[in-house]
Structures are given as C-alpha cells and as structure tokens.
Amino acid sequence: GAVFTIPADRIEGGTFLCAAAMTGGELCLKGLEREQLGAVSEALRMTGCRLFWEEGGLLWMRPPRRLLSDFSIITGPFPAFPTDMQPLLMALLTLAKGHCMISETVFEARFSQAEGLCRMGADIRIEGRRASVFGVERLFGAEVFAKDLRCGAALLCAALAAEGESLVHGSEFVERGYEKIETALSLLGGEIRLTEQG
C-alpha cells in the first residue's frame, strides 16, 4: 500500500483570499502550499496585498486600504495564472484603483461574471478574449445571475463588498464546487442566506 496526501484546493483558497481582500479583512489560511498559489499570490501582491507564509502551511494576508491595479494578467496552464481564478480576480479588480487588462487564453466566453459585476456598478469592457477592468470607488447591491461555478463565486464575493443587499441567482452552481461556502464567507463578516426561489 501507499500513503497519499491530497493537496488543498488552491482555487477555493484563492476565492477566500479575494473575498477578504475585497472586504478589507485580514485572513489566515491553513493547508495551502506556497507553490500551489504561485501566480495567484503574485497577482494579489500586485494589488497591494501583503502575504506572509509561516511554517505548517499557514498563510496570512493583509489587504491595503485601497486595492491597486495597473497591470496585466494572462491565464494559462499551471504555473501560469489559473483560468478558474480569473472571475474572482476580475471581481477584486473592480474595486482597485487603476486599470487592468485580463487576457483569457484557456476558454472562450469566460467573462460571464462581467454582466453581473457591471449591474453592481463595475466598469468592465470586453473585447473578444480580453477584458479591461477600470476600478470604481464602490459596488452596489443588485439582482445578478450566476451562469457557472466561478461566475457565481465571483458574484458572491462582489456582493459581500457591495453596499446594500444583493440577490445572486444560481447558487446551485456554487454549491457544486464549494462546501458550505455561505458558512465560510460568513466568517469574513458577510450575511448570506440560501433561499428557494418559487
């Protein structure tokens, strides 16, 4: 026989890092390896977040008073920036001071979260496989629609950071990829309720 250690989910970890950065909260994650987060942690650093690694796989993240932008991201296979984190980074960048260009090289039509983010007040312009994100001062609660798993997670993170209440349809997509995400995000100070729509 053999013993295997299953690595932590870097996309789930990245989701919580983005949510904390958007809401201005400090976060400690346990169980992730530095190499797993590579390009994600580098992108967070470019927004002004400070990341500290401790022994035993502890990662501390402290966001700046105002997130920063003015850089470009290109998605790609590991170790490049993961396409599954692109919607979350886009959500974060909506509140960053400056402009960022995101180039999606893995999947076509991977910017479905942009429509919902714009309903919340974001300034995003799509041109083919490239998205230009111009940071705004604040987002506002809105009724939005998750069209896939990561789109839903991005909209939830944006709803946490937005002023007022948001209604995010399509929670079944998010529940498929995250275990009790509403509980985890509530630890960041959000008030989330899952409801059945008739």
Where does each model-flagged region fall?
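Short, structured segments at the rim of ligand-binding sites
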Residues: 1-198
